[in-house]
Regions:
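Rossmann-like flavin
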Residues: 66-129, 382-413
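Core beta-strand elements of the Rossmann-like FAD/NAD(P) dinucleotide-binding domain
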Residues: 2-5, 191-201, 488
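Glycine-rich FAD pyrophosphate-binding loop
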Residues: 25-46
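N-terminal glycine-rich dinucleotide-binding loop that anchors FAD/FMN and/or NAD(P) in oxidoreductases
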Residues: 46-75
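N-terminal Rossmann-like FAD-binding beta1-loop-alpha1 element of flavoenzymes
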Residues: 7-32
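An anion/pyrophosphate-binding glycine-rich loop and adjacent beta-alpha core
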Residues: 244-246, 253-399
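Conserved redox-cofactor binding core of oxidoreductases
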Residues: 41, 93-195, 213-216, 267-268, ...
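Glycine-rich loop(s) and the adjacent beta-strand/alpha-helix scaffold that form part
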Residues: 193, 197-271, 479
Length: 490
C-alpha cells in the first residue's frame, strides 16, 4: 500500500493533532498515522489530568499571582539544572516561557479549552528553587476533554478534505533518497500488510521512551542510583522509542534520554491495559512516608509538591526500591488522588456540584474504589492489624511494628504540641502549602495518624512509576531535527 502527501505526521497525540490542524489550515495535504486504535485518538494526553505550565496568564493575574516570563525562566533554569553544553534545552526553555501564553494558552482558549479557575502550585522546589508561584493550569475536564476538543476541531476543520487518518499503522523505518528524508515505511498491525508513504516533509510526534521499561532502565538518571526491581508503567504503551531508533538510523541526534520525569508513588492497576500498568497517586502530604521496614524516611521527610525528582531519588536509595505511605481514612478522603482522567470522573465529565462535594466532604468514591480493588493498599482498624496485613502483602515479615508505631506516635505527639511548637519539617511544609487556597482545600490541618476518630488506618505500598521523557530527538527552534553536528537533517 502506497501513499503520497505533502506532510506525513507520525503520532496522533495532541502534538500530532495540533500539527495536522495547523497544516491543513495552511492548505497542505496531511497523512496522520498512529499505531493505536482510532478511539484512542489523543494519546497519553487523553488519559492525563490535563495540567499545563504557564507563566503570566490572565488566570494568574485574576488571583493576584504576579508572574512573568523572566521569573518563569529563572525558576526553570534553576530547577532544570541546565549545564553549559545544553544549548538547545536552554533555547527551548527561553522560547517556551516567552511564547507559551500567546501560542499555547491563548491558542487553546480560542479552541474552546477552559481551565480551572485556580492554578495549582506544584514543584515548589526543595534544595533548589522551583516554581516561585502557582503555574500549573488544569484543563476543566482533564486531558480527556483537551484531547477531545482538539480532535474535534481537527476532524471538523473546513479543510478536513486535506486530511487523511490511518490507525493501527506501525512505522518502523524512515525512507531517504539522495541524503534526504522522503517518507516512511511500516506495517498495518492487524493485517500484516506493509505500507509506504512518500512526503515532502515528515513530522515525528510519537512520544518518548518511557512506555518501554527496559529503555527506562537503560537510560536511568545517575541522580537516582540503581533502578529499582519494580518500575510500573505509567506512560503510553507505544511510547517505546521505535521512532527514536528510526530517526537515529538516518542521522538524527538523540540526547538527554536520562532526563525523565518519573514518579515515586505508583500502584498496580487492577484492570491493566499494558504490561506492568501502574497508576500514579498524588501522595497525601499528611501521610507518613516509610521505607520497606516501616521506618520513617529521613532525616528530611518526604512530602509531595516540592521536588518530584528528589522523591524518586530518595525511594531508589532504599534497599528495596519501594516505600509505604501510612495514613487514615480522613486523610485519604481529603488528600488521596490518582493522577489522570480515569479516576477523576467528576472532573473529567465536568460535573461541578460533584467536584465541589468531593472537595468539601472528601472523595468517598475514589477511597472505596482504591481500597476495594488495589492490591497495594491495605486497611485495618488497629495498627497491629495493619502491620500484619502489610506483612501479608510483602510475604516476608519485613515490616517492623515497632518502627511503624514509633514513626506514627512521635509524629502525632509533635502535632499535639500545637502549631507554635511544630518542630517537624513535614508539618512546616504542610503549613506552608496550606497558605495557597488550592492546597488548603486538599490538605488536612495537621491531622494525626493514630486518631481513633479518623480511622480506619490505611497503608499504601508504592513503587516508582515511569511517565514522561524530557529528552529525545534534538531540534532547533524551527522544530527541525538536527544531526550529530548540529545541522538540520534534510
Amino acid at each position: 500500500m502506497r501513499h503520497r502527501t505533502d506532510v506525513v505526521v507520525i503520532g496522533a497525540g495532541i502534538a500530532g493533532i495540533a500539527t495536522a490542524y495547523e497544516l491543513i489550515g495552511r492548505g497542505r495535504t496531511v497523512l496522520l498515522l498512529d499505531r493505536d486504535a482510532e478511539e484512542n485518538l489523543g494519546g497519553l494526553a487523553k488519559e492525563s489530568f490535563g495540567g499545563i505550565w504557564f507563566a503570566g496568564t490572565p488566570l494568574q493575574r485574576r488571583y493576584g499571582i504576579r508572574d512573568s516570563a523572566a521569573l518563569g525562566l529563572a525558576d526553570w533554569l534553576a530547577f532544570g539544572e541546565l549545564g553549559p553544553k545544553d544549548r538547545w534545552p536552554r533555547a527551548w526553555a527561553e522560547a517556551y516561557v516567552e511564547r507559551c501564553v500567546r501560542e499555547v494558552y491563548d491558542w487553546l482558549r480560542d479552541l474552546d479549552v477552559e481551565f480551572m479557575p485556580m492554578p495549582m502550585w506544584v514543584e515548589r522546589g526543595l534544595h533548589v528553587p522551583g516554581n516561585s508561584v502557582p503555574r500549573w493550569h488544569i484543563v476543566w475536564g482533564t486531558g480527556h476533554v483537551l484531547s477531545e476538543r482538539l480532535a474535534g476541531h481537527l476532524l471538523g476543520h473546513p479543510a478536513r478534505d486535506l486530511l487523511t487518518t490511518r490507525f493501527g499503522h506501525r512505522v518502523d523505518e524512515l525512507l531517504t533518497h539522495d541524503g534526504r528524508v522522503t517518507g516512511c515505511r511500516g506495517v498495518v498491525e492487524q493485517t500484516g500488510e506493509e505500507f509506504e508513504v512518500e512526503a515532502e516533509s515528515l513530522v515525528v510526534a510519537s512520544g518518548g521512551i518511557n512506555g518501554d521499561i527496559d529503555r527506562v532502565r537503560a537510560n536511568w538518571h545517575t541522580d537516582w542510583g540503581r533502578p529499582p526491581e519494580v518500575i510500573l508503567n505509567g506512560s503510553h504503551r507505544f511510547a517505546d522509542g521505535r521512532l527514536h531508533d528510526a530517526a537515529g538510523s538516518v542521522g538524527a541526534a538523540i540526547t538527554h534520554l536520562d532526563w525523565q520525569w518519573n514518579y515515586a508513588a505508583g500502584v498496580r492497576h487492577w484492570r491493566p491495559r499494558k504490561p506492568g500498568h501502574g497508576l500514579s497517586l498524588v501522595p497525601p502530604k499528611s501521610a507518613l512516608w516509610l521505607d520497606w521496614r516501616g521506618e520513617r524516611i529521613g532525616p528530611m521527610p518526604l512530602v509531595t509538591g516540592y521536588d518530584t525528582h528528589d522523591l524518586v531519588a530518595q525511594i531508589c536509595r532504599q534497599e528495596r526500591g519501594y516505600s509505604w505511605q501510612l495514613l487514615n481514612r480522613r486523610i485519604a478522603l481529603k488528600e488521596l488522588a490518582v493522577s489522570g482522567a480515569e479516576f477523576n470522573p467528576a472532573f473529567r465529565d465536568r460535573k461541578r456540584l460533584r467536584v465541589a462535594r468531593d472537595l468539601l466532604l472528601g472523595n468517598r468514591w475514589l477511597y472505596e474504589e482504591l481500597t476495594a480493588n488495589c492490591e497495594d493498599i491495605v486497611v485495618a482498624g488497629t495498627l497491629p492489624e495493619l502491620v500484619e496485613r502489610m506483612n501479608e502483602l510483602v510475604g516476608d515479615g519485613s515490616v517492623d511494628y515497632a518502627a511503624v508505631h514509633e514513626a506514627a506516635s512521635r509524629y502525632d505527639e509533635r502535632i499535639g504540641r500545637g502549631p507554635r511548637f511544630h518542630n517537624d519539617e513535614q508539618l512546616r511544609r504542610i503549613e506552608f502549602a496550606r497558605r495557597w487556597t488550592g492546597d488548603r482545600l486538599r490538605t488536612c490541618r495537621f491531622q494525626k495518624i493514630l486518631d481513633p476518630k479518623a480511622g480506619p488506618l490505611v497503608a499504601i505500598r508504592e513503587f516508582v512509576i515511569s511517565r514522561k521523557s524530557m529528552g529525545g530527538l534534538q531540534t532547533d527552534l524551527e522544530s527541525r531535527v538536527l544531526d550529530l553536528r548540529g545541522r538540520p537533517v534534510p
